[in-house]
């Protein structure tokens, strides 16, 4: 009878741990999607380097661009 309780406890805690990691992994994926939606191009602080004044913030790249169109294309 005591052996049965230990097995039940082991199964319970294993499932609890599995649920925790599944929820944690799902939360990270959702954060990545939300981060992509928050991307934007902004004018950087003067002076501009090589006439590139637009910066991508929160997107795929952190480079500088000379036009807003270039920045938007690379950032999103």
From Swiss-Prot:
- Mind telling me which Pfam families this protein's record contains? Meg (PF24153)
Gene giving rise to this polypeptide: MEG4
Q: What is this protein called?
A: Protein MATERNALLY EXPRESSED GENE 4
Q: Where is the signal peptide?
A: 1-27
The superkingdom listed in its UniProt entry is Eukaryota
* Organism listed in the record: Zea mays (Maize)
Instruction: From the record, give the cysteines joined by S-S bonds.
Output: 53-75
Instruction: Give the family this protein belongs to, as stated in its UniProt record.
Output: Belongs to the MEG family.
Tissue note? Expressed exclusively in endosperm.
Q: Which UniProt keywords apply?
A: Disulfide bond, Signal
